[in-house]
Amino acid sequence: MTQIIDGKLISSQIKDEVKERVAALKAKGREVTLAVVLVGEDPASQVYVNNKKKACEYCGINSKSFELPESTSEAELLKLIDELNNDAAIDGILVQLPLPKGIDEDKVIMAIDPAKDVDGFHISNVGSLCVGRKGLVSCTPAGIIELLKRYNIIIEGKECVVIGRSNIVGKPMALLLLRENGTVTVCHSRTKDLKDVTKRADILVVAIGKPKFIDGSYVKDGAVVIDVGIHRNEEGKLCGDVDFDSVKDKTSAITPVPGGVGPMTIAMLMNNCVAAVENKTK
């Protein structure tokens, strides 16, 4: 019987735990404050930012919005980040991506104080993950590890295949699985005989940005399949990188889209916000 991994349920549990940790800090006179920076008026970005603000409100985290016009220059954005870095009342800084053309995203990410980098994108935090030190970890991969652990899915000793090598998901995902003692293979657009590789996977994480690309022929019986993708099909319905109906019956566990990995990303962002404060107060 296939287990449908419920990201909404687990994300709610994590947000409740974060809420308790925030309350404990408040009892000691310590607030948690996240600065949310949005440049331009991209509708999808506005939705994501609003969802993050709602999660902050639920968890008792203060959120401060900095909504800048599309015409904002890179220098102006970097100046704001510098001010937020130096503001002791700000614990976390989130710059909503993508940024308008003409602004170097890497430069902006690198300008954020690593201790306030709640997205976990700064090279210092990525490096800490690489060498096994404590740091703020990219939210989506961290959320996937939480899903696996809370569903008692063993990673140690398992063949883990990650499809996709992005800095936001693929690479940190591989490092986190390695940290949990999985045997990890990363596939990408130049991988030969992709099916031969994916059919070895006990745990298959798919983050390639192609709707319903992975069907049942890519998956071995009893595998755990984690779908990171999110798209709208021709009918306007949400779907992932995995063809859920084709794959589901072959798996022992699978994340749906929506309601799988997506909610975990915001829950782990909230976790990083409170961790940024706890790391300073220890």
Task: Give each language-model segment a name.
Residues C56-E70, V184-V186:
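Short beta-strand elements in bilobed, periplasmic/extracellular small-molecule ligand-binding domains
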Residues E76-A88:
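Short, well-structured alpha-helical segments in soluble
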Residues V32-G40:
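Short beta-strand segments enriched in small/hydrophobic residues
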Residues Q96, A207-I208, V228:
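Short, well-ordered coil/turn residues at beta-beta hairpins
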Residues M1-R30:
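Positively charged, low-complexity intrinsically disordered leader regions
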Residues D106-D119, V126, G229-K280:
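Rossmann-fold NAD(P)-binding glycine/threonine-rich loop
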Residues V95-I155:
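Anion-binding alpha/beta catalytic cores of soluble intermediary-metabolism enzymes, centered on
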Residues E41-K53, K101, G135-V224, N233, ...:
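Glycine-rich phosphate/diphosphate-binding loop of Rossmann-like nucleotide-binding domains
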